[in-house]
Design a protein with these regions (language model features):
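Helix N-cap at the start of a conserved alpha-helix in ABC-type nucleotide-binding domains
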Residues: 40, 161-163
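Walker B catalytic motif
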Residues: 154-155, 167, 171
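Conserved beta-strand
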Residues: 7-10, 17-27, 34, 57
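ABC-family P-loop ATPase nucleotide-binding domains
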Residues: 75, 81-138
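Catalytic Walker B motif of ABC-type/P-loop ATPase nucleotide-binding domains
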Residues: 150-154, 159
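Walker A (P-loop) phosphate-binding loop of ABC-type ATPase nucleotide-binding domains
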Residues: 36-41, 55
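Conserved ABC transporter NBD signature motif
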Residues: 51, 57-68, 72-73
């Protein structure tokens, strides 16, 4: 079985926090939970995988060095970070216009199909979305270019149980569609992982 992510002794030191010798793999066809309380280093680990945070150690994605082959790798990754998204003054339709130029594999039909499935309006500004609607839009945007790997940082935090379960079902379906796909999901809600 191939690994879509491999970490070996990844470390990052801050003034008041240290991530020390983190090692794990995310095999193809699997959803792997990165579990820990707030402040445990989950986001730092994810940002190290994505090369947003420069860390020591070895990170391989699809068997390739995450620093040397970053642009090739990122084309195949869908990411949902809590602190990253486009302007609240955009609509879903405008996000489509931007993303189709960002990703070579952007699938317009899939994006609008997901918006319909999630019951998201295409012409309403994001600032007027609920937190659950915003998360669904982030997920639709992350999935619409058919990535091989999803990396999700606390995607269900602060959502009501019904929306949370709906989003978790989306992740399960994403994996079931293609056995070479993987998800790395950080959470402090262990029942989320039990659900999927």
């Amino acid at each position: 079985m191939k690994n879509n992510i491999e970490l070996q002794n990844v470390s990052k030191k801050y003034k008041d926090f240290e991530l020390k010798n983190v090692s794990f793999c995310v095999p193809e066809g699997c959803i792997v939970g990165l579990i820990g309380e707030n402040g445990a280093g989950k986001t730092t680990t994810i940002k190290s995988i994505l090369n947003i945070t420069k860390a020591d150690g070895v990170v391989k994605i699809f068997g390739k060095d995450n620093k040397k082959e970053e642009s090739k790798i990122k084309e195949q990754i869908g990411v949902v970070l809590d602190d990253s998204f486009l302007s609240d003054y955009l609509t879903a339709k405008q996000i489509h216009s931007i993303m189709k130029d960002v990703y070579k594999t952007w699938d317009e039909n899939k994006f609008f199909q997901l918006l319909k499935q999630f019951q998201l309006p295409t012409d309403k500004m994001i600032k007027d979305f609920s937190s659950g609607m915003k998360m669904k839009l982030k997920i639709a945007t992350a999935i619409a270019h058919n990535p091989k790997l999803l990396i999700l940082d606390e995607p269900t935090s602060g959502l009501d149980p019904v929306v949370r379960n709906e989003i978790l079902d989306i992740f399960r379906n994403y994996i079931e569609e293609d056995e070479t796909r993987s998800i790395l999901l950080s959470t402090h809600i262990t029942t989320d992982l039990e659900h999927i």
